[in-house]
Amino acid sequence: MGQKTNPISLRLQNVNRNFDSCWYSDYFYAKCFSRDLYLNNYINTFFKLYRLPQARVCVNFGIQNIKVYPFFCIPKASRVSLAKNLGLFQHLSKAWNSSPKYFVSSKSKQLSQLKINDASLPVNNLNNNLFFNSSKHNEIRNKQNFFHNLELNKLNLSFKNSAYSDVKNYSFLENISAKLLLNFKEKSVINEVYYTTTNLGQIGNNISTNSIYSKQDMSDNSSKSLLKMLLREYYKSSDNKSSILYENKSPKSLENIFGKINEVSNINKKNLYLLNSETDNIPNLYKRKSKPTKFLRNEHNKVIEDKKTSLYFMPDSNQIKNDIYQGKISKISSISNNSKDSLTDYNLHLYQAYLHNILGNSKSLVSRNQFKYKNYIENFLSSQYNIDSQLFPFISKQNWQSAGFIADEIVYFIERRVSFSRIKNRILRQASMQSYVRGIRITCSGRVGGKSKKAQRATQECVKYGETSLHVFECKIDFASRIANTSFGLVGIKVWICFK
């Protein structure tokens, strides 16, 4: 019996036994195969240059577009537990060093170099141990010290604002998910300021900058809810019911109003950026039932009249210039009519330092739409093949969904000089607990002795568990190979996983 034209159909059974799939695979096989190899090589090389974890890439070739699905693994819970069992306490704070921090922009790292010149007004930093093994009273104590210092700052705002007027960096809001602000029903701990006056001459007298924090609100709310409250002061929700009421909407009178607001709130010469809803929409900042905001551009002294506009601070100056050039953002030099609070620059500076301490240690995940290299890769692949290319990155928390994820775990611990015999015992114990895994086979070649004397010798060790038959069509085998760079040389790792 001769070889089948399409032998892969024997394993796929009822999926690939159609006439059209047979001639399509024969005619376009070489072209699709070369593109698949190129896309896998390009994406993994691109991620490697930016120190991203190696992804499992799946490509779907269509008639009018190409869809690429890279799958990343962020096994925080399993890696931390495995590090504890192997005794890597000194590396415990970096147990997920190959995961979410590479999805965070480098602009947020600039805040770590931000220094406060005044020694009498320190900002307490949150320790890294707070997220692993510290008690709850340490977290509450840090919050109380922060808010206590914030109250002391209110007494010296007159001369402190001039010192921090040039320090205006909103990059700490770049990677905060806007979903935290949706369905926000809790009472804010910050007293909001309402502009409800109709007299143009008395508007300056009705503005206040109260930011009083009660101890009861601090004890009841967790750090996540506190982060929501702080973010709400920057993202003005579309559900605001109070706004400035104008009787005379001439450009001259409105400029006087904004001038008085700037004098009281000390935010003059400050550029605020509003998203133009005609060219770009941000659905994450609004609820599903809410209508898109409509506001006019600030040309020929025109004023925004919509009462449901919201502010969106763009953190990157280069990104702002590009978006303004493309017409996505309309730059204005005034405040929208629904702005409630008038926080000073020094308070904004303290919010930056406090939020950066939270976000710098939490290593929170990001959604698919916030992947910073998505547009770049799509544009490059589209121009390369003259066809629409789409990238859909996914993040997985379970490392047993692919053999490549298990190989990355082995590489992580071998590079930290953990012997392969200790690693295989932990992995086989985890494999027995997975209901959808039929068997696993791991082969390691090189100096895999760890810190012992056996590390001087290069050996090849293999471990098997369950059924991993490579010559049976019914077995769903997944294969991956990795290379670990150790101080003793390179170590080759191969993993086979058989799924049920």
Swiss-Prot record:
GO BP of this protein: translation
Superkingdom as given in the UniProt entry: Eukaryota
Cleavable signal peptide: none
This protein's record includes keyword Nuclease: no
Subcellular location: Mitochondrion
UniProt-listed Pfam families: Ribosomal_S3_C
GO molecular function: RNA binding; structural constituent of ribosome
Primary site of residence: mitochondrion
The name this protein goes by in its record: Small ribosomal subunit protein uS3m
